[in-house]
C-alpha cells in the first residue's frame, strides 16, 4: 500500500496535532492549545468541547485576524511602499545634475569676450589702439576658434615695435629706489679717521666716493676696491729694501631679479695711501756701530653697523579688463674691508755682525660687523578668468666682511756673517668672512676663550674648557674644586664628561705646571657633588649626594680623592662622556576589567523555558512520522 505525498502530509500534520495535546509543563498549556487550535480546529474539535464556544470561536479567531491578516499585511504595505518612496528621492539628486548645467552657462560668458574680436577690427585704422591687446599674447590663445582674427593685427608690422617702447613704464617707480639707500652711504666711510700722533706714523687719508647710477633697463654692478701703496725711502748706508705692494680688489656681482625693474645700488671706493720714510743714523768713524730699528704699526678699527632696508615695487599691468600684479624686491649689499700692513726694518752694519730679533707685531685693529638681517617672503597672486595662482619669492641681504693683514719683516745680514741667510717673510692670513651676529675676529696667535652659550640645544656636549698659555696657571691641589656655576637651559639629554677619580691608597699633592702643553682649568662642577681638599697626612672622605639610580650633569674637570690616600699621583687628562637624564620617568599602572556587567540585565526568563517539553515532544513525533513516511516511500 503506497500513500501519496498529500496523505503523508495530512497524517504528519494530524500526528503533530495529537502529540501536541500532551499535558504541558509549567502551566503553559493555554498558549500551546491556542496555537494548536489556530492550526487544526477543522480536524480536531474535542478539546474545543471543554471550553465555551465564545473562547473557541471568538478568541482564537481574533488572533488569526489580527496577526495573520492585519499585522502581516500592514508590514508588506508599509515596507515595500516606503522603500518605493526612496527611489523617488534619488530622483531628486537628478535635479542636481541640472544645476551643474548652470555652470555650463559660465563658459558661455567667456565666449562673450570672444564676440568682441571684431571690435578691434574697427579700430585697426588706428595703430595705437591694437597695441594694447598685443601686450597680452595669451589673450589671442582664448579665441583660438577664430584663427583669422589674430592675423588682422599682424598686418601692421610697426605695431609690435611700439610695445617694445613700453618697458620703461615699470621703470617709473625706480626713480626713487636708488635715492633712498644712497643718502646714508657717503656717511659710513667718513666716520673712521686716524689722527696723526707721531711724525713717524704715516698719515692715513680716507676718501669716500659714492655714485648712484640712473634708472635704466640694465642693472648696475657695484665695485669696491681698496688699494694700499706704501712708499719708503732708505739712505745709501742701508741695504736696499723693497716693500711689496698689496692691492685687494673685491668685486661683487649685481643680483638682478627676473623682472623689468633693475636693481641699482651705490658703491663706495676706499683708498688708503701710506707714505713713510725712515733714515737710520750711522757713525762711519767709530768702531761701535749704531743700529736703529724702527717699527711702525698702524691700526685702524673699522666697525660698520647698518640697518638694511628692503624696497618692494609692485607693477600692475591691465589689459582687456584683466590686471596682473608682479612684485619686485630690491636689497642692499654692504661690503666692509680693511687692510693693515706692518713693516719692520732691521739694517745691520758691515763691520760687526749683530744679531737682532725682529720686533713682534700684534695687530690691534679688529673688524666687527653687526647686522640685523631679515628675510622677506612675498606672495605674488595672479588672477585670470576666475582662477588665481600664488607664488612665493624670498629676499635677503648680502653682507660681505673681509679683513686682510700683511706682516713684512726685513732682516738683512752682513757679508762677514756666515751661515743663515734670512729672507723676508710675509704671512698673509686668509680672508675671513664674518656672518651677521658672530663674534669679532681675533688676530692670529691668540687663543680666544670659549664663551659659554646661554642656551644649549638637545644632545649637545659640555662647553670646551678655557685654554691658557703654558706655565701661566697657578698650581692647584688636585682635590680642590672650583666653585660651582649653574648652567642655563640645559636639555635633558646633555652629555657631560664624568669626574676624574683617583685610585685608593694615594695622597693628592699639588700638580706641577706643565711647560710643553697648555694647562686645562677645572671647569665648574654641577650641584650635587662635594669634594674636600686632601691635606698631607690626613684622610679625606668626600661625600657624593648623587644616588646610584639618579644621574645629574657633572662639568668636566671635577676631581675627587678617596680617604686614606698617600703618595703623589698624576692627574689624567682624559674624560669619559656620560649620557645623563634629568627627571624621573613616570610609570602608571591602570587595571581594566576584562568583562563589564551588562547594564541591560533583565530578570525575565528566556522564551525557551516557556515552550517547555511540548515543543520537544512535538519535534519527537514529527521526526518519527517523517522517518515512517520515508520508509514507506
Curated annotation (Swiss-Prot):
Signal peptide: 1-27
First-listed, main subcellular location of the protein, grouped into a coarse class: secreted
GO cellular component: extracellular region; fungal-type cell wall; side of membrane
One Pfam family it belongs to: Flocculin_t3
Transmembrane parts of this sequence: none
Polar residues bias spans: 414-425
GO process annotations (BP): cell adhesion
InterPro entries: Flocculin_t3_rpt
Location within or outside the cell: Secreted, Cell wall; Membrane
Family (UniProt): Belongs to the HWP1 family.
Note: As a major cell surface protein expressed during infection, HWP1 detection can be used for diagnosis of invasive candidiasis. HWP1 epitopes can also be used to develop vaccines for protection against candidiasis.
Record protein name field: Hyphal wall protein 1
Native source species: Candida albicans (strain WO-1) (Yeast)
